A protein has these predicted regions:
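Extended oligomerization regions of viral-like shell subunits
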Residues: 45-48, 148-241
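Short helix/loop capping segments that flank catalytic or ligand/cofactor-binding pockets
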Residues: 54-57, 95, 169-172, 269-271
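Alpha-helical scaffold segments that mediate packing/assembly in large oligomeric complexes
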Residues: 88-155, 164-166, 278-283
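Signature of extracytoplasmic/envelope-associated structural regions
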Residues: 3-5, 16-17, 21, 25, ...
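Extended, low-charge hydrophobic alpha-helical regions
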Residues: 76-93
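Extended, compositionally biased alpha-helical segments that mediate assembly or anchoring
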Residues: 244-283
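N-terminal "assembly arms/tails" that initiate or stabilize quaternary assembly
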Residues: 1-73, 276, 280-281
Length: 283
């Protein structure tokens, strides 16, 4: 007898995974722009149109200069993430709807954590705008935006991803919590769905997946630790998803139980490094 209905269970896993994503929220979904991904190890191509050069002032009798539109092919490897649970027959009688929902939630969250870590790794490995500071305050956050020049409209930003160890630093910033500032948001500091608040209307998202590094001291030296703050513009980091997670159920007769596996395919690519700024904060 089936423990779950795979199609229904898949909806629950997908919902939980989408809700649990943190770094995934600052990545732009390119799924509808590419072909369906079907096989792990294959390549998926993120289409990016190259910027044309600046316009020129047309003189009397002059002609228009035409520039050919070109595209840069950003290929990424399709990856396979999976997790599973096993339910013994003697426990199955207790697996009511609420417990099945809990299983779907945990499976979805575990898939999300794996994808989040991969997105952060892609960013940290390829970022070109990187700085290291020994404290984090308003001035350092503003300096992290300098690399965007005059192209830093709040509406163009996907979000600010921070390790949870940096939350107290934001709570001490006037630019984040002061009621006298025009760029702050009421309720900042109250974490809702993983969002600490809004910095100049840009969501500040907490994520500990891949955003912290601890190094033990060598030969009696001091330990060191670094937490990351990552600013990403919309479209700078892309992700492609399989249409929905695949759920499979299999009977394990040796153990008198049932195994349930959840899996999905995805690909991640930093497609525009000019839209990414990374700040390593020494703690």
């Amino acid at each position: 007898m089936a423990v779950i209905i795979p199609e229904v269970f898949a909806v629950g896993v997908n919902k939980a995974m989408t809700s649990a994503l943190r770094a995934g929220r600052i990545a732009t979904d390119y799924t509808e722009l590419v072909d369906d991904i079907r096989y792990c190890g294959n390549k998926v191509h993120f289409p990016v149109i190259d910027r044309i050069s600046g316009a020129s002032v047309l003189s009397d009798g002059g002609t228009v200069t035409f520039q050919r539109v070109s595209m840069t092919d950003n290929a990424a490897t399709i990856k396979h993430v999976t997790n599973g649970v096993e339910i013994l027959d003697r426990e199955n009688v207790q697996v009511k709807a609420a417990l099945k929902d809990a299983m779907a939630k945990q499976l979805g969250e575990s898939l999300a954590q794996a994808v989040d870590s991969d997105i952060v790794s892609e960013i940290l490995t390829n970022a070109t705008y990187v700085d290291t500071v020994n404290s984090l305050d308003d001035a350092e956050v503003e300096n992290a935006f300098v690399c965007f020049g005059d192209q830093r409209d709040a509406a163009s930003m996907a979000g600010i991803l921070i390790n949870s160890r940096l939350a107290p630093h934001f709570m001490n910033m006037d630019g984040f919590v002061s009621a006298t500032r025009t760029n702050t948001t009421n309720g900042n500091g109250v974490v809702v769905d993983g969002v600490l608040g809004y910095y100049s209307t840009i969501p500040v998202i907490l994520s500990d997946n891949g955003t912290y590094k601890f190094t033990a001291g060598q030969n009696g030296g001091e330990d060191s630790s670094v937490a990351d703050m990552i600013i990403v513009k919309k479209g700078a980091v892309g992700v492609v998803w399989q249409k929905e997670p695949t759920i499979e159920e299999a009977r394990d007769i040796d153990k008198l139980g049932t195994k349930i596996a959840a899996q999905t395919l995805y690909a991640v690519k930093a497609v525009d490094l000019s839209g990414v700024s990374v700040l390593h904060v020494e703690l």
